């Protein structure tokens, strides 16, 4: 009897418990579930790698741009330095030989006046003799009004000083007399410098006179612009041969003059005869 009750009690208890479980709401899991996808992770990694690659590329481009700008700045700076160096060298050449000592105005003028003759006389004018002799020997001389004439324009060269560049050299020969003239200077300053070069080299003038004597020519006149240069006097030693040659030349010149005079007289008589004939 008690066993039956116990069995019924257990049955009823099971039934009750089962009923309770059925009537009660189902249990729910309130935990948040996160789904991890390997594909999403890989995509994020690729995006991160791509962004890092882009960042590196942009950084590299920026670095290259900065380097290019720096190179251009350095190149411009080097060109400016080179130009300044050239200008400085030109300035140094322009003032080569000049003293940078500060001198008062009056003292400076006196120093220039005192030093000028020394600087001028140091320039060699041997080229004048050379060009005159070569012209007399080799060039064809035109004849104008009974005088033989040569005119040269002096170009810039290593032998011609700057004071004579662009000037005209005129040689006029009349018989055995030769006249030398430098003209057509750029300005009065150039003419004055050229005149100083000639007058401060008397020994070379003497050499020119002697050289022309060897060509049976006498330097009669030497002028630079409107300045007439005083010629050195050279004593001529007369030898029997010189005297004979001088006598022969004198006779030839006299015969030539007589012949020209006779020709003029004959022409005059012939003209008067023709006029008389025409009148008749």
UniProtKB/Swiss-Prot annotation:
Region entry Disordered, spans: 1-83, 248-280
Pfam families membership: DUF5421
Biased composition (Polar residues): 12-25
Bias-annotated ranges (Basic and acidic residues): 41-71, 249-280
InterPro entries per record: DUF5421
Family under the similarity heading: Belongs to the chlamydial CPn_0705/CT_671/TC_0042 family.
Protein name: Uncharacterized protein CPn_0705/CP_0041/CPj0705/CpB0732
Species per Swiss-Prot/TrEMBL record: Chlamydia pneumoniae
């Amino acid at each position: 009897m008690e066993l039956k009750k116990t069995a019924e009690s257990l049955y009823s208890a099971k039934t009750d418990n089962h009923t309770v479980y059925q009537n009660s709401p189902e249990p729910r899991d309130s935990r948040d579930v996160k789904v991890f996808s390997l594909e999403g992770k890989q995509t994020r990694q690729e995006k991160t790698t791509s962004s890092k690659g882009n960042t590196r590329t942009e950084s590299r481009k920026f670095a290259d741009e900065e380097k290019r700008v720096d190179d251009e700045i350095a190149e411009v700076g080097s060109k400016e330095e080179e130009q300044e160096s050239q200008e400085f060298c030109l300035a140094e050449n322009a003032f080569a030989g000049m003293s940078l000592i500060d001198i008062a105005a009056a003292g400076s003028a006196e120093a220039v006046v005192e030093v000028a003759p020394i600087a001028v006389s140091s320039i060699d004018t041997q080229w004048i003799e050379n060009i005159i002799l070569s012209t007399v020997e080799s060039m064809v001389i035109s004849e104008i009004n009974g005088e033989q004439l040569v005119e040269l324009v002096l170009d810039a060269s290593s032998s011609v000083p700057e004071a004579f560049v662009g000037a005209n050299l005129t040689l006029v020969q009349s018989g055995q007399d030769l006249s030398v003239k430098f003209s057509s200077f750029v300005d009065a300053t150039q003419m004055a410098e050229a005149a100083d070069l000639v007058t401060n080299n008397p020994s070379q003038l003497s050499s020119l006179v002697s050289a022309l004597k060897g060509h049976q020519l006498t330097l009669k006149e030497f002028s630079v612009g409107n300045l007439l240069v005083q010629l050195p006097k050279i004593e001529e030693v007369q030898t029997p041969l010189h005297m004979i040659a001088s006598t022969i030349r004198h006779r030839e010149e006299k015969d030539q003059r007589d012949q020209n005079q006779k020709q003029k007289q004959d022409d005059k008589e012939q003209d008067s005869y023709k006029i008389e004939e025409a009148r008749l």
